[in-house]
A protein has these predicted regions:
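Contiguous, small/hydrophobic- and glycine-enriched helical/loop subdomains that border
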Residues: 1-68, 100-105, 112, 116-124
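Short, acidic Gly/Pro/Ser/Thr-rich loop/turn segments
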Residues: 8, 77-80, 166
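Residue-level signal for pocket-adjacent positions within structured domains
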Residues: 40-41, 50, 81, 88-91, ...
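Conserved beta-strand residues within beta-sheet cores
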Residues: 42, 52-54, 131, 142-144, ...
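Short, acidic (Asp/Glu-rich) active-site segment that either coordinates a divalent metal cofactor
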Residues: 64-95
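Conserved, helical-rich catalytic subdomain that frames metal- and/or nucleotide-binding sites
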Residues: 96-151, 189-192
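Conserved RNA-binding domains used in RNP assembly and mRNA/RNA metabolism
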Residues: 141-192
Length: 192
């Protein structure tokens, strides 16, 4: 599912839209099924240690304003992951819950939660609320991580997100780096 949005946010705040979208996916999945999911910065939703959903946010912006955003969401609903080469890395609602899930019901719930959280994201108080909510379900918080960035690999402990939705990583010297994008992996444990 992809949506075109016209947020009244400065470009520096758009990483929060990815987090907000992941939060809306969480609320929709948990509101329509018995599944309980976690969020992984910057754009993933996990269930039982496997990736259930992903979010991709693309934008066009000027220096001080966002012109538009394309907010794309992919959820493994009734896909069968067990027995494929994705087993161990990804999962689906059907595989985890052992039953088919109504895509229509999930889509309606997702659109409802997206609308609500998108409206919330238009105000400073709403953005703070989104940050707090994301932090509650942050799979990386307090865990050892490696983050692949265009500039190399950053290792340390995930220390939450900042006010603009960037991942904070504390290295062994105590220095905290704020990362705008990257692929984060929990180290020292194997997921799924």
């Amino acid at each position: 599912m992809s949506l075109i949005l016209y947020p009244s946010l400065p470009p520096t705040m758009t990483p929060l839209l990815s987090l907000a979208t992941a939060l809306a996916v969480k609320r929709a999945v948990e509101g329509t099924t018995s599944a309980r999911v976690d969020l992984k910065w910057p754009n993933d939703v996990y269930l039982s240690g496997g990736k259930l959903a992903g979010v991709l946010v693309e934008m066009a912006a000027e220096i001080d304003r966002v012109k538009w955003v394309i907010d794309s969401i992919g959820i493994n609903v009734n896909n069968r992951i067990v027995g494929t080469d994705l087993e161990g890395r990804a999962t689906s609602l059907a595989d985890e819950l052992w039953k088919e899930i109504s895509r229509r019901e999930l889509a309606v719930a997702l659109l409802m939660h997206l609308e609500k959280i998108y409206r919330e994201a238009q105000s400073p108080a709403g953005l703070i609320s989104i940050q707090r909510s994301f932090r509650k379900y942050d799979l990386l918080q307090g865990r050892p991580v490696e983050v692949k960035t265009p500039d190399g690999v950053i290792s340390g402990t995930a220390d939450g997100i900042d006010s603009e939705g960037r991942l904070l990583v504390r290295d062994i010297t105590g220095k905290v780096q704020s990362l705008f994008s990257g692929e984060a992996t929990i180290t020292g444990i194997q997921t799924r």
